[in-house]
Amino acid sequence: MKSVITTTISAADAAGRFPSSSDLESVQGNIQRAAARLEAAEKLASNHEAVVKEAGDACFAKYSYLKNPGEAGDSQEKVNKCYRDVDHYMRLVNYCLVVGGTGPVDEWGIAGAREVYRTLNLPTSAYVASFAFARDRLCVPRDMSAQAGVEYAGNLDYLINALS
């Protein structure tokens, strides 16, 4: 799984060298942010049901046409699948926070996602709206510390950009 540490080691190994001072500084910075990432992961895990529901609700409020006949959310079963997908991606964001890298999203969330959604007539813009809402509803210090919020928002930004 890709993280700052595994990426640094892989790059050094591929070049046949020891990690450089700047490589080690990058790893050290990643380790120093670990407490904030773990706080964000814990807060997300303990509130994930509300986060997923609010994000999904925001998506269907913004894209109400999705509930029209022939659209991605034209039955309760399809709506439930959309919420399931939002929950899946939020778990991947949580995993990214824990490992300190984008590996979980890259490996389990993005590879082929756009093609699958296009085939199933699921607009990625709706998912992007869900994750933007989840990012924007964050309130520091109500939800988490400022640094944890930076880590949380950064991972959601990565996901949003990857799906856009």
Curated annotation (Swiss-Prot):
(2R,3E)-phycoerythrobilin 2 binds at residue 139. (2R,3E)-phycoerythrobilin 1 binds at residue 82. Contains two covalently linked bilin chromophores. Gene3D superfamilies: Phycocyanins (1.10.490.20). One of its GO terms (biological process) is photosynthesis. Its main location: plastid. GO terms for cellular component: chloroplast thylakoid membrane; phycobilisome. It holds the Pfam family Phycobilisome. It comes from the Eukaryota. Keywords: Antenna complex, Bile pigment, Chloroplast, Chromophore, Electron transport, Membrane, Photosynthesis, Phycobilisome, Plastid, Thylakoid, Transport. It is found in: Plastid, Chloroplast thylakoid membrane. The keyword Thylakoid applies. The keyword Membrane applies. It is a peripheral membrane protein. Belongs to the phycobiliprotein family. PANTHER family: C-PHYCOCYANIN ALPHA SUBUNIT, PHYCOBILISOME 32.1 KDA LINKER POLYPEPTIDE, PHYCOCYANIN-ASSOCIATED, ROD 2-RELATED. Heterodimer of an alpha and a beta chain. Light-harvesting photosynthetic bile pigment-protein from the phycobiliprotein complex. This is R-phycoerythrin alpha chain. It comes from Pyropia tenera. The lineage of its organism: Eukaryota, Rhodophyta, Bangiophyceae, Bangiales, Bangiaceae.
